[in-house]
Amino acid sequence: MPAVQAEHWRRELERTTGAFDAAFPKQPGRRYASSRMKPYLLFRWAAEMVRNPAVLDAVEDLVGPDILVYHTTLWWKPAGSEAFVPWHQDGTYFGLAPHEHVTAWVALTPSTPESGCVTILPGTQRQGQLPHVDKPDPAIMLSRGQTVAAEVDAAAGVPIPLQPGEFSLHDTLVLHGSAPNRSAHDRIGLGISYIPARCYHTGPTRLSATLVRGENRYDHFDLEPEPQADMDAAAVAAHLDSIGRFWRASELMPEMSLVH
C-alpha cells in the first residue's frame, strides 16, 4: 500500500481514537468499550484497512475465498516505551477451530528492530498448540502476560521490519513477540485477525465477525455492519455489542481475556 495511504490512516487513527476516548472515558465495568479493539466497527479508516484488496488477496491465497475478520487490535507502542510482547501463539487465546486463523500486521509507522517490530520463530507453527503460563508484568502488552511455557531460543528469532503501508502475515500457531521501542517515534500498527468462514468459535457464546470477501457459507458468526460514518450511533452500538459478546465469551473461556 502507498506510504501516503498509511499516513492518512495514521492521522485518522489519532483523530478518531482521541475523539472516542474523550466521548467514552474508561470506567469500571466498561473495559470492553476500548477503541483499540475492533476499530473497524467504529471508524471508516479502519473499515477500509480491513477490506484492502492487497491484504485480502494475500490472505485468500492462504485461507481461501470466503474471509471473515474475527478481531483486530491496535498495537501502539510509544517511543521509548518499555512495553513488549512475550513469545506466544495467537491460537492460545482466540477460541477458534480449526487453527486456520491468519494475522495481518499492517504498519502505520516504521516498525523496525529498534522500534520493537514483530519477531517470529520460523517453523514453530509445526509444533502445534503449546502450553502457556501467565506472567503478570505491567510492561507486557498482553493483559495477563501470557508467555509460552516451553524453552525458546530467542537467538533464532527473525525480525519482520515494515515501512508504513507494508504488512506481514503470520500463522496462528507461530511463536512471535516484540521487544521494547528504543526509537524516537511511536510504533503503530493494526493486527487484523482473518479467518476462513469455515472456522468457528469453540465456546458457547454466539460471537460476531465481519465478512470482507466471498460468502458466509457456514453461519458460525453473526455478521457485523460496516460503519457509515465515524462513531455514528449505529457504529457505536455495533461495536459495544460485538466487544460485549467477546467479553462474555472470555468469562466462560478465561484464556480469551488476553485479547482485551
Residue ranges of model-derived segments:
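Active-site region of the double-stranded beta-helix
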Residues: 65, 91, 96-97, 106-117, ...
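Short, surface-exposed loop/helix-turn segments at secondary-structure junctions
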Residues: 89, 144-154, 185-186, 204-211
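Short, solvent-exposed loop/turn segments at secondary-structure junctions
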Residues: 1-3, 75-77, 92, 111-113, ...
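A generic structural micro-feature
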Residues: 96-100, 151, 182-186
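Short, conserved beta-strand element in jelly-roll/cupin
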Residues: 88, 95-113, 161-164, 169, ...
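Non-heme Fe(II)-dependent double-stranded beta-helix
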Residues: 1-96
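Double-stranded beta-helix
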Residues: 113-179
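Non-heme Fe(II)/2-oxoglutarate
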Residues: 23-24, 173-260
